[in-house]
């Protein structure tokens, strides 16, 4: 499933500190085209900080970030906007604007990056709503009128508004029941397959790691300690990794795998 001939995101020697606390220390990481990379680590290890740094939402002390072949520190403002428009982000709690409808939330990236008539934006937003499995009448609802699962899907629709190449997911299944989480996993795989997405997924969800990730990267002590396939994670002798994947809470099977997802992954 992973196209290793094409690296679309390369992080080299990234360091980030907040005051005296060194969060990331010369960290290196690659993401390949059309892969789903699961990103894990202890709480407070800097997983979300790295994602925010890649997105330009947090300042780095040093290092190089190359996205779609471009060093983001050396591109023009116009090129950076083009790169930003080719990335979609689903934040942990959705981050929908409460005063806007689902339709209006999805249109926000379109308004920022595109010059489109309102009618066309309405049509495109409705297509994204259907793409993530929401009913069309969800378009007129406000976030307060949605369930947790619907909020996740609406936020995902917004992340997909500009047909990105690279999708960032921050704890996408947190707060969902097992059935809803399994359906969300299935949706991510379907979107990767149909849209050719590359997915960077911060998660603590063992079921998601087992079910949909091509590779897993483990952050600890400010760097990538281990990265590889699920099988390689199970063979890893690192104490934290072994406890995570083989401890009492670890799942040895795919209990949340739906028939549709099983068929797609086979």
Task: Give, region by region, the residue ranges found by the protein language model.
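A short, proline-enriched helix->beta-strand linker immediately N-terminal to the Walker B motif
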Residues: 161-165
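The feature captures the beta-strand-to-loop junction immediately N-terminal to the Walker
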Residues: 40-42
């Amino acid at each position: 499933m992973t196209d290793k001939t094409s690296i679309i995101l390369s992080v080299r020697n990234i360091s980030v500190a907040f005051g005296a606390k060194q969060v990331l220390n010369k960290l290196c990481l690659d993401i390949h085209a059309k892969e789903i990379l699961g990103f894990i680590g202890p709480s407070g290890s800097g997983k979300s900080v790295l994602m925010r740094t890649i997105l330009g939402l947090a300042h780095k002390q040093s290092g190089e970030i190359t996205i779609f072949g471009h060093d983001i520190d050396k591109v023009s403002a116009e090129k950076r906007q083009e790169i930003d428009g080719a990335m979609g982000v689903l934040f942990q709690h959705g981050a929908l604007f409460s005063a806007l409808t689902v339709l209006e939330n999805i249109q926000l990236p379109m308004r920022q990056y595109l010059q489109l008539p309102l009618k066309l934006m309405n049509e495109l937003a409705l297509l994204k709503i259907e793409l993530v499995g929401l009913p069309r009448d969800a378009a007129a609802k406000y976030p307060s009128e949605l369930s947790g699962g619907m909020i996740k899907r609406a936020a995902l629709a917004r992340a997909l508004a500009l047909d990105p190449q690279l999708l960032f997911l921050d704890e996408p299944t947190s707060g969902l029941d097992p059935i809803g989480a399994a359906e969300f996993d299935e949706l991510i795989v379907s979107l990767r397959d149909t849209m050719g997405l590359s997915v960077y997924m911060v998660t603590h969800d063992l079921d998601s790691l087992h079910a949909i990730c091509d590779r897993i990267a483990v952050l600890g002590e400010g760097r990538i300690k281990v990265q590889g396939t699920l099988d390689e994670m199970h063979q890893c002798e690192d104490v934290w990794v072994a406890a995570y994947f083989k401890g009492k809470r670890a799942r040895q099977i795919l209990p949340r795998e739906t028939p549709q997802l099983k068929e797609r992954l086979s």
